[in-house]
């Protein structure tokens, strides 16, 4: 029986990151809405409770509170951002609107020597104060500590940025330790979970395989399952896991919607039929998809259409399988959170995903999502544990809607053909270029990264087609052709990301090749936006 951490979700977009950090400490956790009953909290029997952030305000909204049972259990509690504020209010403190809202990077001073922060610091001031580089995102502030609490941290704009009641094991921070921008955030959460809560670090992927296989077999029984392959990591690992559980009861449906990467169809069929020996049905539905996308420019509408057409194709294939009762998808946690699909339904929707946003109730198939509670790095770990080849597991993610969300505005076959070739050239250059000692000296990578390809050093890289034309000169003639943007990011969880600082020489070669080899593109730009504020995909 695993020790469990209960994460109460108040609607933050990054609540799942808290779960990821807890699991990185090899401790099992679950996310549940903040308004669960006292009985549920008691029956869950957590080793500790973590209260998430929220886009709401404790000062204005008095409905979002933690159940009373949280305070009656006698277990450690960690409040994060809004979680700190509701802890303060519920335990007798005071929260008010801040005149100095904090959004982004901040330097925070630790006070005292609490068990949570003692010895954890990024640098020390000349006066000897330990400082932490943290990520803030709040408009309210704790103005008065609850009885029994002491000041744990502060910033110039937030006098109470952390508080602690060590006797009861209650800790709260105004910053977000779960995001990668907080340098020591992972260490802080690990200390809370392992040392303060005393949870056993026994959550590993091999255990998850056994549990997931058993769950799939129990759910499916002797019924048949169809799964749509996109060529990406998520659907590949989902297929391998389900195949491990039920073998030939699984039929993989590979849909060519006309929005695939260059030579993707052949690669997917060779990999799954040749390596996994799985049943794969190849469906060419490119005319159907592109026809329905004609004239559509709104990103949400495009995603909905692509999702709807996937469902129709699956329904048609399911009718050919007499026992097909299940539709399997490679949905993972980031898909769910970006669709406003956390269990509380309080998160603000950023964009819908075809995996979770276009499935009608009239589908006629039950939904099987074995990866729904996993993050991308966990999915990769699971793939390795399942014995999948590295070229499959560590391939960059590819969205289900394919190039449809990498072509801005209306999707046309002409645009898709241009983008396919530009994208392939960019990936070739990333795969063919290794990091050098000069790159490390310039701060583009770490010394341990020297010798690795830039494809392996980036988490996701691709080209984006911009349906605008610019003037150029090639030879002695004037050109008026399209623009493409290159995008490469580095991240551990895909909830936040930094743009990749690629060598100029690599970018120069990619640009030169695209302009010379892809007739119809005469300008290449590089996207240097992080997430947040941008998302990784452009649409």
From Swiss-Prot:
- A Pfam family annotated for this UniProt entry: GMP_synt_C
One annotated GO molecular function:
ATP binding
Its UniProt entry gives the catalysed reaction(s) as: XMP + L-glutamine + ATP + H2O = GMP + L-glutamate + AMP + diphosphate + 2 H(+)
Q: What is its EC number?
A: 6.3.5.2
Q: Which residues bind ATP?
A: 230-236
Catalytic residue list: 81 (nucleophile), 176, 178
Give Gene Ontology CC terms.
Answer: cytosol
Q: Does the keyword ATP-binding apply?
A: yes
What Gene3D superfamilies is this protein classified in? 3.30.300.10, 3.40.50.880, HUPs
Domain Glutamine amidotransferase type-1 positions: 4-202
- Source superkingdom: Bacteria
Keywords of the record: ATP-binding, Glutamine amidotransferase, GMP biosynthesis, Ligase, Nucleotide-binding, Purine biosynthesis
Part of which pathway?
Purine metabolism; GMP biosynthesis; GMP from XMP (L-Gln route): step 1/1
Start and end residues of each GMPS ATP-PPase domain: 203-395
Q: How does it assemble?
A: Homodimer.
Protein purpose: Catalyzes the synthesis of GMP from XMP.
Entry-linked HAMAP family: GMP_synthase
User: In its UniProt entry, what is this protein called?
Assistant: GMP synthase [glutamine-hydrolyzing]
* Gene that this sequence comes from: guaA
């Amino acid at each position: 029986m695993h020790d469990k951490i209960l994460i109460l979700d108040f609607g933050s977009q990054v609540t799942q990151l808290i779960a990821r950090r807890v699991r990185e400490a090899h401790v099992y956790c679950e996310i549940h809405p903040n308004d669960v009953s006292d009985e549920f909290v008691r029956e869950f029997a957590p080793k500790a409770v973590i209260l998430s952030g929220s886009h709401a305000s404790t000062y204005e909204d008095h409905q979002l509170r933690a159940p009373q049972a949280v305070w009656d259990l006698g277990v450690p509690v960690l409040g994060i951002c809004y979680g700190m504020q509701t802890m303060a209010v519920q335990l007798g403190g005071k929260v008010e609107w801040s005149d100095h809202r904090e959004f982004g990077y901040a330097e925070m001073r630790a006070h005292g020597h609490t068990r949570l922060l003692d010895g954890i610091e990024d640098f020390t001031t000349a006066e000897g104060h330990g400082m932490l580089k943290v990520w803030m995102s709040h408009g309210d502030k704790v103005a008065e500590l609850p009885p029994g609490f002491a000041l744990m941290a502060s910033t110039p704009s937030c006098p109470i940025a952390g508080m602690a009641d060590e006797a009861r094991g209650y800790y709260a921070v105004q910053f977000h330790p779960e995001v990668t921008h907080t340098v020591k955030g992972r260490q802080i959460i690990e200390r809370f979970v392992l040392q303060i809560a005393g949870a056993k670090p026994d959550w590993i992927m091999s255990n998850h395989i056994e549990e997931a296989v058993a769950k799939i077999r129990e759910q499916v029984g002797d019924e048949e399952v169809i799964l749509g392959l996109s060529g990406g990591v998520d659907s590949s690992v989902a297929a391998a896991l389900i195949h491990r559980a039920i073998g030939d009861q699984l039929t993989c449906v590979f849909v060519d919607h006309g929005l695939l990467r260059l030579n993707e169809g052949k690669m997917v069929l060779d990999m799954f039929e040749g390596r996994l020996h799985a049943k794969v049905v190849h469906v060419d539905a490119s005319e159907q998809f592109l026809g329905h996308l004609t004239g559509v420019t709104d990103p949400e509408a495009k995603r909905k259409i692509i999702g709807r057409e996937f469902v129709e194709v699956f329904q048609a294939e399911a009718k050919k399988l007499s026992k097909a009762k299940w539709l399997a998808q490679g949905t993972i946690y980031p898909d769910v959170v970006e669709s406003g699909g956390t269990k509380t339904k309080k998160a603000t929707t950023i964009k819908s995903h075809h995996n979770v946003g276009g499935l009608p109730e009239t589908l006629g198939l039950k939904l099987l999502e074995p990866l729904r509670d996993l993050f991308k790095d966990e999915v990769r770990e699971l793939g390795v544990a399942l014995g999948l080849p590295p070229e499959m597991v560590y391939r960059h993610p590819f969205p289900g809607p394919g190039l449809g969300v990498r072509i801005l505005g209306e999707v046309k076959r002409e645009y898709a053909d241009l983008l396919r070739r530009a994208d392939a050239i960019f990936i070739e250059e990333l795969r063919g270029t290794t990091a050098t000692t000069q790159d490390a000296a310039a701060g583009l990578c770490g010394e341990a990264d020297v010798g690795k390809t830039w494809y392996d050093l980036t988490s996701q890289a691709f080209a984006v087609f911009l349906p605008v034309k610019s003037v150029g000169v090639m030879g002695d003639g004037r050109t008026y052709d399209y623009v493409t943007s290159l995008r490469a990011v580095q991240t551990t969880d895909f909830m936040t990301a930094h743009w990749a600082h690629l060598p100029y020489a690599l970018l120069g070669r990619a640009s030169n090749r695209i302009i010379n080899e892809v007739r119809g593109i005469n300008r290449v730009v590089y996207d240097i936006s992080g997430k947040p504020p941008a998302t990784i995909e452009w649409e």
